[in-house]
């Protein structure tokens, strides 16, 4: 049995396909990325907030590490490689393979990462359970427009990620309908996916 994104499944969820038995189990995932989403505090307190993958790793079953990453520009991969993977990852792509996209005034053209501070504007979302920042959502819409107007990227090449469901709604409200091919999701909703450019609203 193969279970993909196994680190996002709680232990009980991962055990369901094993009920009838299996000679071999292959769990595919990364226990250094997002853990399973557990809404119930009681379930979390009961230890149901981790994956079978994580438990087996803690018990000493050594996961096999895929050492070459092909997704990110080397300047972007440097942080997670050093912080989470003890500098064990190698870049299978070069800066030339992942050129800096036109459409933004990059502080450093060779470093395709930019932080844009947006002052104020954070409020509770109308549902009361999340946060949103309409000012930041408007900035995201402007950045998106600049990237697409430059002509190098298609809508499908750009993703917008935010930790908050309320901010997902605020961004969708700010982005013109003509850009409905751009995916806007929460961090959990983007796990395992990739785009040429990610705009992160936090």
Model-inferred region functions:
Residues 1-202:
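Conserved helicase motor core of SF1/SF2 NTP-dependent helicases
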